[in-house]
């Protein structure tokens, strides 16, 4: 029984169960894939600084988690060029960082996606129902608690397994039940959030369009993540239920230790290392690569015609998918576009003392001035009303209206006579 359970704890002398030439090629391929993802995410973080995006946001936290995950996986596979015995005799902290921490990081990225889409849904509701803000705080607390529970279980199981202070079967059972159950729950909650986003498309699509995507694309990406994470968890739970306690080496495809797969030579022949790499590719590298590509950093638009004027300030439509989900909801504004000719913004904080300034327009040209059938510059059709208030320096208490440029015809708004 001890030989069958040897895969649960790193054992000295275990090597990938493939010929050296094949093992070297697979190791080089695995290392190259993870290294490419690492440099891709690293470049995305530099683009955040280059384009002047918000430095601390959902997007940057997500990219930082993916960067750390790719770095740990690249370091792990680099051991298998020449230092396989050394990789199997690591201390508790390096062992946990290389073998267990990447799984925790993937779970954190899944909870981060849940948090963002839940925020999109709640921000769409909070304008009409302010009490929904308490529900958002409860959702955030639940996902933070799930992340801490996942981290605590994996750390304790790794430490106890390394020191052999508990039965391997009991540790494996607890770790798989807790970790994979949390994966399934978070995958289902992500599916529910995406359904709510799709159902409330008129009020939630603005957040997704600010990133350059659509509700359909976000739903497709979220559905793929749900299938990948849920299938991984269901496979592990099913395999654990079917595996007897004396034959754990037929299971343990749970990304816990590369040497576990080297112990599968009796069941898989010389394909243990290959199977392990394929499992990592399907259930780790593929979903992370899709997420990084979907949430990549975009260049802000340079065309000022896409800007909006809100309360006398110009805001370009370069909102970031992870920065402020409720930006437009908080400002309380709505945009109306009529055949590309005018942009209209109504200020929701108007007071009873505010009067709408008239638009100073040039007098219409006389027929003798423009002999043609129509004047070369027709009269502007401006629908923007932007009262800019200031305190009367004379102390009379009357608001003053300062001149402001019009966003559609570039003329001037002047106070009433």
Swiss-Prot record:
Keyword annotations: Autophagy, Glycoprotein, Lysosome, Membrane, Transmembrane, Transmembrane helix
A GO BP entry: positive regulation of TORC1 signaling
Polar residues bias locations: 345-354
Cytoplasmic side: 53-60, 111-140, 197-218, 296-417
Biased composition (Pro residues): 364-375
InterPro entries tied to this protein: GPR137 (IPR029723)
GO CC terms in record: lysosomal membrane
Lumenal side: 1-31, 82-89, 162-175, 242-274
Chain ranges passing through the membrane: 32-52, 61-81, 90-110, 141-161, 176-196, 219-241, 275-295
Region (Disordered): 344-375
Location in or out of the cell: Lysosome membrane
Glycan-modified residues: 4, 257
Predominant location category: membrane
Top-level lineage group: Eukaryota
UniProt membrane topology term: Multi-pass membrane protein
Annotated family: Belongs to the GPR137 family.
PANTHER family, A to Z: INTEGRAL MEMBRANE PROTEIN GPR137 (PTHR15146:SF5)
Task of the protein: Lysosomal integral membrane protein that may regulate MTORC1 complex translocation to lysosomes. May play a role in autophagy. May activate Wnt/beta-catenin signaling to modulate epithelial cell function.
Name of the molecule in the record: Integral membrane protein GPR137
Native species: Homo sapiens (Human)
Taxonomic placement: Eukaryota, Metazoa, Chordata, Craniata, Vertebrata
Gene designation: GPR137
